[in-house]
Structures are given as structure tokens and as C-alpha cells.
Amino acid sequence: MSTPVLELRGIVKTFGATRALDGASLRVAAGSVHGLVGENGAGKSTLIKVLAGIHRPDAGSLLLDGQPHGHFSPRQVERLGIGFIHQERLLPARFTVGEALFFGHERRFGPLLDRRSQQREAARLLDDYFGLRLPANALIGELSSAEQQMVQIVRALLIKPRVLVFDEPSVALVQREVERLLRIVQRLRDDGLAIVYISHYLQEIEALCDRVTVLRNGRDVAEVSPRNTSLEQITRLMVNREVGELYPKVAVPAGALLLDVRGLGRARAYQGIDLQVRRGEIVGLTGLVGSGAKELLRSLFGLAPPDSGEVRLDGQPLSLRSPREAVAQGVALMPEERRRQGVALDLSVQENTTLAALSRFVRLGLLSPARERHTTLELIERLRIKAHGAHAKVRQLSGGNQQKVALAKWFARCSSLYLLDEPSVGIDVGAKVEIYRLIGELVKEGAGVLILSSDLPELIGLCDRIHVMHRGAIAARFAAGEANSDRLLAVATGAQRAQNEERPFYAYAIAI
């Protein structure tokens, strides 16, 4: 690499007795996308806060174009041409698009704020950069997550940065929005910017990055090229263990039949679904978008009631007319959209944990905060939730800990059937292992688990059986030990037929 535009060299940062960064380094070239990956606690956030001027390092240096710079304030960072796209949308909800774009860089006509000029320029910039036609007087709070992010990117580009840092930019986006984001990043790279891209989604890292720095325990342990390094190798560098160790296999003999689905159908979604889950069993479900797998899981929780067929739970008919009825009969759902549907971000850990089981904490007609707190503290310890007590806001927790809180509320209710929709999406590898451990605890206690996942290695590593849906039907079934990525992908592409089916099935694999 020629002289990098940006270099962080030997950065050390301690907080009390905790050494968050232990000589970490990062080198980023112009016209490249440089990935930064690592488990929670590896030091990614601290390193970026040092770069942003929020934290003063105890040792180490920052160089721009090979020239050393001392510690600087966030405002000075901006003047040096370093911009940031943060995971959390930081633009005030009551600002207009024009106000948000030019906040801190307001346009004036004499002593007066020139709002009209700002609004015209804001609309032009959004259209020029992204073809996004938003009214400049639209409120930020009325925009989608993707639209807010576009505003944030344009705002960062107004300082004419040479370095742009994307911190978990795709967390709140749906797939088509992620694809647009990746195209934008590629365009910025082609324009000559040096991009730092931080993500738990290693598929994005593989597709986008020219180089990747791996952090572990506050140190940069490797800098690799995704073209020459597999995602499994990157994962191994992150966690310092073999990929096979990520999936703790739980030796639990299958128990009595828990969920029995016969001939289930829903118009324009799926038909003729037969599916069984026994107590102590983990069953996998996968399929392309539109295959019917997502709709099937929603139906089993009463969100999209089926039109035909029969579902029994513990031998009794299961009513699927509403989520309320499903929950009352022992069904739990952990949705993919964790931040929107799985937890209430502005409520505390305690309020989230007890939300689905409030009747357990009522005495003499009144809610008992003491009993709520006792149960919450037990679950915080059992699920190893990292939070500053039961009253910490869920918004303040990492993605992995938010996922644990989403699961904790069903632990509190002692549900018998757990429907897990993409349970490890958007969390780092270490947090995934914790979620897998908790899934193992559920089956040890006699629950049944149905996992919908697009991560084939995850399904292969965890499940006793895997069902694959295609065009609204279960097209293939695999027992544990029968499936591997090569075989699944061969069948998925139509190159090979499943031995136990007359037609091919289709699935897609997303590595760890």
C-alpha cells in the first residue's frame, strides 16, 4: 500500500482497569473500502471514537497523508475532512430535511437564516447524489430509516470529506435498502474517498471491502483481503476458535410431539404444509424471499391466520386467529426486526422482560415491582445480559444484548414452542454463540424450537432437521448429518436433486 490517507498507529486507550485498545492500528487508502470487524468488546467503537475526537488516546498516533496529528475535537476532525455515518440516526426528528442537512453550516442572508435557499439546495443535493426526491420541508421524523440515512450521508458529504466512516449502517434497513446503500458506498469509493466500513454482516464485508482489519481484545490481529480470505477464516480470526465451535450441539433426546402441522395453507403464501417439532428438538426452516417460509412462521404465531389445515400443540388444537391466542397457548416469537418488533427500545430491561408475563407478577390485583425485579435480575444473570441493572434502557444495549432481552420475555413466560426468525441477524459472532447457548438451554428444558434462517451454516450447525421451502411448499427435508453447504447449494441451484424429493428445492446461504 502507498502512503495511506488515514493511519491510526498503536492506539492505546484505558478506562479505569479496562484496556479497551491495546496498540490497535488501522491503515486506509484513498479510493478503497476498508472493513473493520470484531466481536462486541473488541475495540471497534472505542477506536472510532478516538478517530472522531471523542476519546483522547493514552498512546499512539493519528496520521493523515503520512503527517502526524495530535488529539483534536470533533469539530477539528470535520475540518480535517473525516466524516461519520452513525448507526443511530442523530438528526433531530423535528428538523426539516433542509435544517438537518445544514445544521452547524447554516446559510445566511445578512444576519438572517436563509431557509429558502437551504431547502432548495437540500432538495438538489439529495436528487443529485441519490435520485431521492424528498420535499426539503419534510420533517426528519416522518422519513424512513433509509431516507434518514441518505440525509445523513449527504450531510457528511457537505464537508467534502476525504475519509468517510460508516458505523453499522445497514442495521435498520431492509434488503433492497441495503443493496442501494452498498451501491452508494461503491460510488463514493470510485469517486476517490477512503471508506471505513464497520459491520457485523460479514456478507457485506465480503461484497464491498478491498481490505479488512480484524480487531480482537483491543488489538488488530490481522489485515486481510476478502478475495483471498474466506468468511470462515475471518470469523476464526475474530473469535480465536474454530467455526465448528460456534454451534454448541446439545445432546437432548427428542421427546413427545409438541407441534403437529397438517395440510396448512394460506392463499398466495403456502399450501399443504406438514411439519412436526418434538420437545427437545431444534427444527430449521429456510427458503428464498417469497418461498412462503416467512409467512408460515407468521401464521404459527397468529399474525397471518391460515385458510386451511390443522395445527396441534401438545395434542390440542392450536388457535391461530391472533398473536394473543398463540401466546396464551404457549407459543413465542422472536421476530427478525428486533428493534422494531422484538423489544421496546425506550422501556427498561425489566419492563421488556416482564411484558409478556405480567399476570405472573400480580398480587391482590396489583402489579408487584419487587417480583418483577427479582425475575428480571434472575434472567439478566441466566442469559448473561450486559446491562447496568434492571432499569437500564434497552436502547442503550448492544444488538446481541437486545436480542437476549427479546428472548428473556419468553423465558419469563415459560413458553413451550419458540419460533425464532433470523435469531442471529445483525449481531456479532460472540453474541451469536450466546444466543445459540440459550437455544440449547430451551431444548434441554423440554421446549421445542423452530428456527427460520437464511444462514445455512447456522441451520446445519444447530438443527436436528432442516426443511426447505420453495414456491409455497416444503420441497426438501434433511436430517442432522445429511446436509452440508455444498450439498444444499448444489440442490439450491438445481444442479442436484434432493434424494428424498422428486423436485429440487431452493435456498440461499449466508455465511457466518
Swiss-Prot record:
It is a peripheral membrane protein. The keyword Amino-acid biosynthesis does not apply. InterPro entries: AAA+_ATPase, ABC_carbohydrate_import_ATPase, ABC_transporter-like_ATP-bd, ABC_transporter-like_CS, P-loop_NTPase. Keywords: ATP-binding, Cell inner membrane, Cell membrane, Membrane, Nucleotide-binding, Repeat, Sugar transport, Translocase, Transport. It is an enzyme of class 7 (translocase). Its main location: membrane. It is found in: Cell inner membrane. ATP binds at residues 38-45. Residues 6-242, 252-496 form the ABC transporter domain. GO terms for cellular component: plasma membrane. Belongs to the ABC transporter superfamily. Ribose importer (TC 3.A.1.2.1) family. The complex is composed of an ATP-binding protein (RbsA), two transmembrane proteins (RbsC) and a solute-binding protein (RbsB). Part of the ABC transporter complex RbsABC involved in ribose import. Responsible for energy coupling to the transport system. This is Ribose import ATP-binding protein RbsA. It comes from Pseudomonas putida (strain ATCC 47054 / DSM 6125 / CFBP 8728 / NCIMB 11950 / KT2440). The lineage of its organism: Bacteria, Pseudomonadati, Pseudomonadota, Gammaproteobacteria, Pseudomonadales. The gene is rbsA.
